[in-house]
Regions:
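Short beta-strand/loop motif that positions the catalytic acidic residue
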Residues: 239, 245-247
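Serine-hydrolase catalytic machinery in alpha/beta-hydrolase-like enzymes
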Residues: 83-100, 105-179, 284-307
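C-terminal catalytic histidine-bearing segment of alpha/beta-hydrolase fold enzymes
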Residues: 268-332
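Bacterial N-terminal signal peptides
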Residues: 22-33
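Conserved alpha/beta-hydrolase "acid-adjacent" motif
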Residues: 252-258
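Primarily recognizes the serine-hydrolase "nucleophile elbow" in alpha/beta-hydrolase
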Residues: 168-238
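Bacterial signal peptide processing site
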Residues: 36-38
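N-terminal cap/lid segment of alpha/beta-hydrolase-fold proteins
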Residues: 47-102
């Protein structure tokens, strides 16, 4: 399948705060060795692009898969605009799947997507979490709600700072409207979603005013971890709560070489699979059908059509560690 060739653009966007821009300009002139600034309230408008959609596409990402077959067909709720945005302007799409015996007193998971947007792998992960932990599961969208399908360019206003604000919005809703216990609420994401996990738990004062009261821990699968201190690639770590990271040695989408050692070593635990590509847990037949082990495909990303090879063994090892991580925090 040929990749969708639309180049992402940012129109009508307010710039990040001067605190970001001035330090980054000096760094570019060689007057500073790094470029960093704290996220502030002045940055919220830039990282809250308008919500423009109230329904999800039936066949997302250039009609490459069926949303119905990966939600309703497998017993997951349809995507609905139920999460009030961080800035209070509109609602994010999400699939909310409370446990039939009640929400409180059991684990809850927020599942967040990568740069291709929600895909069958995210819904397969949601099913596994629901069944393995008898959990409540919220599958959160950040792109469809804003009239787009992907963020392949990565370092844009649709990147990690926007995503963290969406996580805060989802955590608020989960606690205040759904009745979940934040002491047992977990964030899990892959690729750019994994990046979002790392950024969410980074000791950034603006975010940490809220997140400790919303989430217990985070799980990052093959995360993007480029960090140069700019608004688009802000710092990652140290972390304000428990974080579990998984990486792959054959990952050419989010290669481990881009990760500062401190980003990985600051985690509660970091597991590396030397033979794994990006997306080793890919649901290559959809969430409704068992995956084909060993099959390799290519990403639709126009900037990097990296290989994605399913590995049942790596997926099983990862899930075993996730299970012990969650249980260890749920039953101290």
């Amino acid at each position: 399948m040929k990749a969708w060739l639309r180049r992402p653009t940012d129109t009508g966007a307010r710039l990040p705060s001067l605190a970001f821009l001035s330090r980054c300009a000096l760094a570019g002139l060689g007057l500073l060795t790094g470029c960093s600034a704290d996220f502030t309230a002045a940055d919220v408008a830039y990282f809250q692009p308008a919500i423009t959609a109230s329904s999800a596409p039936a066949r997302p990402l250039r009609e490459s898969w069926s949303l119905h077959n990966n939600t309703r067909r497998v017993g997951l709720a349809e995507m609905r605009p139920i999460i009030p945005a961080f800035n209070g302007q509109g609602a994010l799409l999400a699939s909310w799947n409370p446990h039939p015996a009640g929400v409180f007193g059991r684990p809850s998971f927020i599942v967040i997507h990568g740069g291709h947007g929600l895909n069958p792998t995210n819904f397969a992960t949601a099913l596994w979490l629901r069944d393995e932990f008898q959990a409540n599961v919220l599958v959160l969208d950040s792109y469809w709600s804003r009239g787009r399908e992907e963020n392949w360019a990565t370092g844009t206003r649709y990147g990690v700072n926007m995503r963290v604000l969406d996580v805060i919005a989802a955590g608020r809703w989960l606690r205040d409207s759904a009745g979940a216990d934040p002491r047992h609420s977990f964030l899990i994401g892959d690729s750019q979603g994994g990046w979002t996990v790392l950024r969410s738990f980074t000791t950034e004062a603006f975010f940490q005013r809220e997140l400790p009261g919303l989430l217990r821990a985070g799980i990052a699968l093959y995360p993007n971890c480029k960090a140069d201190g700019t608004a688009q690639y802000p710092r990652l770590g140290p972390y304000a709560g428990p974080v579990l990271i998984f990486t792959g040695g054959r990952d050419s989408a989010t290669p481990i070489a881009q990760c500062a050692p401190a980003t990985l070593n600051a985690a509660s635990e970091w597991l590396h699979f030397p033979g794994a590509t990006h997306g080793w847990d890919v649901a290559n037949r959809g969430a409704h059908t068992p995956a084909v082990d060993g099959e390799c495909g290519r990403a639709m990303n126009v900037y990097n059509q990296f290989p994605v090879c399913r590995s049942d063994a790596t997926t099983a090892a990862m899930r075993t560690r996730i299970k012990s991580f969650v249980q260890g925090l749920s039953n101290p």
